[in-house]
């Protein structure tokens, strides 16, 4: 059996520790790339009676989620919520774009927040105009980050 000095043993422990930390860092980066989205697109089809949200993450992988039936939508609105966080974030609000359904429930459209009231007002006006337009079959809204 070979004898290992104390210094060699400590070097081995350090290299294993660095490998583990490096592996965890790589996993964290991959998780971030897969779960952070660079854009979301709402698409509603009046003829198919469905609204879907397509999300594209930082690796350009698309995922699609069925949101609601188009016939259940009454109007478009927003939810105002307080920013949670440290003492510097107290008092600030963010807004979530929602569909107000015919049964008065709200269904969140995008997972990302709007921090400016003017931005969400523009998107609400755009969506309401498209929904009220009788001639168009498709309603779309794209949100990029």
PLM features: residue spans?
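Terminal and domain-flanking low-complexity segments
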Residues: 2-5, 100-145
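Non-transmembrane, membrane-adjacent beta-strand/coil modules in membrane-associated proteins
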Residues: 5, 9-16, 52-115
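Activation on folded, globular domain regions of eukaryotic proteins
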Residues: 22-27, 45, 51, 66-70, ...
């Amino acid at each position: 059996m070979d004898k290992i000095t104390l210094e060699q043993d400590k070097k081995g422990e350090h290299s294993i520790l660095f490998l583990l930390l490096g592996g965890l860092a790589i996993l964290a980066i991959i998780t971030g790339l897969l779960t952070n989205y660079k854009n979301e697109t709402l698409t509603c089809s009046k003829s198919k009676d469905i609204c879907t949200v397509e999300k594209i993450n930082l690796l350009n992988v698309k995922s699609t989620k069925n949101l609601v039936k188009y016939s259940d939508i009454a109007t478009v609105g927003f939810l105002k919520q307080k920013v949670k966080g440290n003492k510097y974030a107290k008092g600030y609000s963010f807004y979530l774009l929602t569909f107000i359904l015919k049964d008065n429930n709200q269904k969140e459209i995008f997972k990302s927040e709007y921090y400016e009231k003017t931005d969400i007002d523009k998107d609400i006006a755009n969506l309401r105009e498209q929904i009220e337009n009788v001639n168009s079959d498709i309603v779309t809204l794209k949100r990029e980050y």
